[in-house]
Structure formats: C-alpha cells, structure tokens
C-alpha cells in the first residue's frame, strides 16, 4: 500500500490571502481548496471511492459545502456521515466525508485527522492513503509522527512538495 504526503508550502498557503482577512482563515481556505482539487484528481484517476476522514466536524461540514461549489464546470458527488453508524450503503457515494476510518474499506483514504490511521496488515487495507501537511509547526510534527508510524509498518511512502 502506498502512503502519499502532500506538503503544502508557505507560497501555496498564501495564494488565497486576498480572499479572506486573517492568517488562520487563509490557511483553512487554502487547505479546503487543496482537498477539493485532490478529491477531483482522485475521482478522475481512480476507479475506487474516496473517504475523507477528519475528527473536526466543523471542518468536515465546511468541506461538504466547499465540494458543492468548488468548480462551476464539474460536480463532486459526495455525502457527509455525521454519525458513527457506518454501513456499506452509507459508503456508496464516490466521496464520503466521515470522522473515523470505516472497517473493511479498500478505496482511497484522505486522512485529515492529526494521527496516522490505525491500519492492520491482517485486515482489509485501503488502496492508498493521502496525508496533507501544512507549514505550521503543529502540522509538521503530526506529519513526522504519521510518517514514522507508516514507515514502521513497512508501507511505501511518497512525498509531494506543493508550492
């Protein structure tokens, strides 16, 4: 299984600086925009469904809204699951926004949570895991911790700097 780390640079994070008024809003908007672009890329290039995991419900809800209006020329079909009642039926959309890793999921996972996914080599594994790291120190440290966790499990790790 492949784990891809997308490391967003300072220059990338500043692209939307004129659209919002505070630095934290710039960062949040830049991350949401990147997640939308990455989601569209995954849908275009993969036959697998995508699960986006985040333990911050407010960010999942903001992403839900952003995905509906992200690109006027395309549509990203998705669903937001706000409860922990994960069923195959609820995971039937091409993109699912959820707070925890669903059991027996074998598609692509975009992990926005602060910790690495608890993956077992004995169970069903996702095809690929995507991790996003922002330039702030907290995110960098979380990224290092995730990298070590996945490396120690023997997964293939790929690094993509985004500027």
Which residues does each PLM region occupy?
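Conserved beta-strand elements of the Class I
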Residues: 50-51, 108-110, 130
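Glycine-rich phosphate-binding "P-loop"
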Residues: 1-31
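Mid-chain, well-packed structural core segment of small domains
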Residues: 86-125
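Glycine-rich, aromatic-bearing surface loops/beta-hairpins
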Residues: 127-163
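Structural motif
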Residues: 53-57, 111-115, 134-135
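Short catalytic/ligand-binding loop motif for oxyanion handling, primarily in non-cytosolic enzymes
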Residues: 60-62, 119, 139
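General small-molecule cofactor/ligand-binding pocket signal
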Residues: 4-6, 96-98, 158-160
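Short, well-structured hydrophobic secondary-structure segments
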Residues: 31-88
